[in-house]
Amino acid sequence: MSMKGKETMSDERIVVGKFGSTYGIRGWLKVFSYTDNAESLFDYSPWYVNQKGEWVEFKVESWKRHNKGMVAKLEGLDVREDAHLLTNLEIAIDPAVLPELSEDEFYWRELFGMQVVTTNGYDLGVVTDMLETGSNDVLVVKANLKDAFGQKERLIPFLEEQVIIKVDREAQRIEVDWDPGF
């Protein structure tokens, strides 16, 4: 394989998109973005692709809108056959390239693994996922095995001040105003 990507050592990456099929004969690929603003995917550089358990670094040489999607040309991929090897692989970035947020803003990944506790001190469980519903984001909380209400999972709306009382990054804890019976 004549890929000119650079192998990297760190394993911490954030998936921000996925490659689709090849486009043309000069190494272009369709790109699907998982970011809120699809084009912001191109603000983050370099990109990393996990190939056979190794993170390989790529730089975007060029990109453009195509129909209702986007296509990208990566440095070192000059023929369709090389680009085809990235089809359906995820695009990841180094967390360090993300903009810093204010004290009251959070990336979803920061909330994963945090303990969720009611204002009365009841331990609801641990955040395992987030859902985007359109009206508001929702915490997916895996309940403790000894949950008094028999819950295995809870969906808690991420409504600041109404439901989410406090997010403590240092203590890895989210305080919520939520009935444990739900």
From Swiss-Prot:
One of its GO terms (cellular component) is ribosome. It comes from Vibrio vulnificus (strain YJ016). An accessory protein needed during the final step in the assembly of 30S ribosomal subunit, possibly for assembly of the head region. Essential for efficient processing of 16S rRNA. May be needed both before and after RbfA during the maturation of 16S rRNA. It has affinity for free ribosomal 30S subunits but not for 70S ribosomes. It is found in: Cytoplasm. Belongs to the RimM family. The PRC barrel domain binds ribosomal protein uS19. This is Ribosome maturation factor RimM. Keywords: Chaperone, Cytoplasm, Ribosome biogenesis, rRNA processing. GO terms for molecular function: ribosome binding. Its main location: cytoplasm. GO terms for biological process: ribosomal small subunit biogenesis; rRNA processing. Binds ribosomal protein uS19. It comes from the Bacteria. Coiled coil: none annotated. HAMAP family: Ribosome_mat_RimM. Residues 103-182 form the PRC barrel domain. The keyword Coiled coil does not apply.
